[in-house]
Amino acid sequence: MKYEKMNNLFLRQSYLDSWEDYERSLKKKKFIKWDYIILTASNDAQAAAYQNQINDRLEKGLLPEDTHYAVLPDPDGKRVGSGGATFQVLRYIAQQEPGVENPFKERRILVIHSGGDSKRVPQYSAIGKLFSPVPRELPDGRGSTLFDEFIVGMSGVPSRIQEGMLVLSGDVLLLFNPLQIDAQLDGAAAISIKEPVETGKNHGVFLNDGHDYVKCFLHKQTEEHLREMGAVNEAGNVDLDTGAVFFGSGLLQALLGLISTDGQVDDVKFHQFCNEEARISFYGDFLYPLASDSTLEDFYKEAAEGELNEALHECRTKIWNAIHSFSMKLLCLSPAEFIHFGTTRELRDLVTRNVQDYEFLDWKMQVNVAVPKEGFAAHNAYVGRHAEVGKEAYLENAYVLGNAKIGEGTVISHVKIKNCEIPGQIVLHGIELIGGKKVVRIYGVPDNPKAKYPNEVAFLGTTLNRFMEMNGVTKEELWKDEETYLWFADLYPICEDHKTALDMAMIVYKMAHGEASEEEIQMWRSSERMSLYSSFNAADIDAFCELNTFLENHVLARRFIWNLEQGMFYQEALKVFGKRGISEEIFRLLLEEAEEAEFSLKIRIYHAISRYMKKTRTVYSGIHYDAIESDCYDTIQNVIYAETEKKLPDNAGYRIAKDRVDIELP
């Protein structure tokens, strides 16, 4: 058997085992679980959205209820770095465990850093990459997200550690078997996997000291430098930093000491390490001092998450003195898989042309799609029967209705398209702002929001420079006080409704290609506009979540009815709802569909719903199964009566001939 096939079989079985661990964590009180699961967020709005997602899962019994959950936003919306966010986590746990010498002792803690801006995949800036879709339907019928994958995949880890904190990066999916882990330690342990040097040069790489401890941490180094350092083995592979790191309770206590006085969190010390100026990095500032070959002089020169300045210099000195005596073990897992949700193009390719690479995990191009069609990827999308979607396009939380045409390779997210044509290789992402106004952002799939003008900045198949020249747009019209990155360019008009916002986005596209009329250019110029950055910060996160739920309900209802229309037995058709079953909202949608359906489909809908309600003993708004059952048989009765009545002879000319007629039996 080939290695790749064995590797995939192992990972598939590992995932199935993790799912069983996950189900046990929901049902068994004595199953060892995480004591804390803590997420970090970029601002209060994103934190509220994360908390709503967690609460929704808790209400549905989809998360272990004994675990303590928390979401910690960067303070006042200031970017404090992943290290600053980690200090917030340490402070929070210390506050939850008052009067304890070491609050991390005998505590199993999972931390997911998910507070980035998602500049390289802007459609996830508002709601965060953490709850972005994964192209898989979970065994209970739900469409999966990165968060769900983390929860399932890490369910077996608590039983493998006595105490400590596992820190994960919110944009990396790591697949492994928890039985591969033995993290009984006081310092740190980095989880690594073997990957080709071509992959490693774009990420962090660990250099093994020969005794399975980290000798050196190499972040985004050239292939040549990695080879010079001896980080590349004979097979051309490196020990890749997966973003997953264990911190023992002793190391955590040492870090807590930096922000404490006499065992109590000191606000002055805390703010020295958690602020926008220092912007401490978890990976750069916490891991570097733990490598055995690290020096304080080189530590000062390490690239910063923000800027190298005096505030960071002082923090690094104190961090070094506190934790350099600890070491970092290297846990190189094999078989294991590292999936990075990086740029928009990488995401699109992952869910379209490369999705077959993960068939062993039941990944597929379409998850929760109303009317299945071939050739494109979709997640929670309602695609009309007459709509045309181009090859390798990706639709996510979107409506595509009427005679709409979507170009090849285009990404559509949170947008409703009806009876219009969308070009290929672009991204359309709709945002509802706080207050109800709408913005539709448009950019090219390969565009990099981190690119800076006046350098050549790719934009919608041309360049931002060319866009400005052709339409007479000045630098001052796009940027006010911000730096001249595409990320900050005020390109997207604020509109009263979604359709107008979509129309204005298409005007931006026409302007990029020199096809906009003077009137259209003037409409754009006179409008109030936002950038990728400002629009995500002003987004109504609750509206995002409501749209996702609204779409999911409509898609599930449509899938169920589609199955019935294709002649599927009702019990099989009901499986689209998974273990969640039929919610109150879906029940209402199905009744509305039944009202409009032709006879055969109508009675099948009523019959299926009534059987489901009877079996599950479900009552919706006081309506019992027998009422729906009666609707089914009343419909049949009415149709039979109507059809029979049609066949009766015309009695319009009948008259009473006699007052009485006597009939005698023989």
What are these regions (language model features)?
Residues 2-358, 390-666:
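Unchanged
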Residues 360-375:
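Long, charged amphipathic helices and adjacent flexible linkers at domain junctions
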Residues 372, 388-389:
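Ser/Pro-rich intrinsically disordered low-complexity regulatory regions in eukaryotic proteins
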